[in-house]
Amino acid sequence: QSPLVFRLARAPGINKILRYVTPRFFIKNTLKEVYYDKTKLTDKKIDTYRDLILRENNRESFINRTNSSPVDYTQRLKSIIIPAQIIWGNEDEWISVDNAKLFSEALPNNRVDIMKETGHLPMEERPYESLELFLNFINEN
């Protein structure tokens, strides 16, 4: 089942309301789904996300993107020949870590790094560890 925020963005009527009303608690609850370590979810971070979503056209763009038809990029991924890094949180509640394997199979020249005790946003939840993985990848390639 897809995350609540996406289900609401697809719901006729509700998605029209979401274009104009985005309560702070809604942002907070959505972020709780993507963070494994809830202690990293500060009031400042919640406010930053709310400020971003409230910017002109952002809500409309999110709803439009959520309601667009899915596209299968598998063949296009297979054509990428440069080294690619896949970083995934093993506790991602939005997109299962099993999908890292699918990306790995589609990308011919890749490295997969699975981060333990990490949710959907490794680069925010564990920025220093994410940076270390990224720099190691860059140095190796």
Residue spans of the language-model regions?
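Active-site-adjacent alpha-helix of alpha/beta-hydrolase-fold enzymes
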Residues: 101-110
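Catalytic active-site module of serine/aspartate enzymes centered on a nucleophile-bearing elbow/loop
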Residues: 110-141
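Conserved alpha/beta-hydrolase "acid-adjacent" motif
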Residues: 42, 93-99
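Flexible "cap/lid" loop of the alpha/beta hydrolase fold
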Residues: 1-16
